[in-house]
Amino acid sequence: MKHLWLILFLVFISCYNNPTPPSEITGAQISGLQYERFDCDTLNDEIIFLENRERELMLAQENRIKESNRQQWWANGMGKGDGIESSELHRVKGEKLAALIVFQSKECN
């Protein structure tokens, strides 16, 4: 029985503080009002910037997952957890969606 509790504890703690995969990070609820004053060219530039930033943050989050997996090996299952990358990715995904909605509502091509 003692070994069972130890195994359950180790299984539980091995899941402790793992970073969230980028595919599971959703976009924040961002109002499109900040993009309403932009013309189509400026909106397009902003969307391109946000897409590039999203890619950078997804790579950073994937690297954090790899580092966390390496750390778990020697730190009794304790990972690095989510950092600033995940919260910024959450915000950037929401901003990109808001900009895309405004872009489509203005019927930009």
List where the protein language model places each region.
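Compact alpha-helical subdomains of small soluble proteins
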Residues: E54, Q61-N109
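Post-signal-peptide N-terminal segment of Sec-exported extracytoplasmic proteins
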Residues: I25-N69
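C-terminal motif of bacterial Sec signal peptides marking the signal peptidase cleavage site
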Residues: V11-S14
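Bacterial signal peptide processing site
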Residues: Y16-P19
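Short, intrinsically disordered, charge-biased short linear motifs at domain edges
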Residues: K2, T26-Q29, K93-L97
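Sec-dependent signal peptide recognition
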Residues: M1-L8
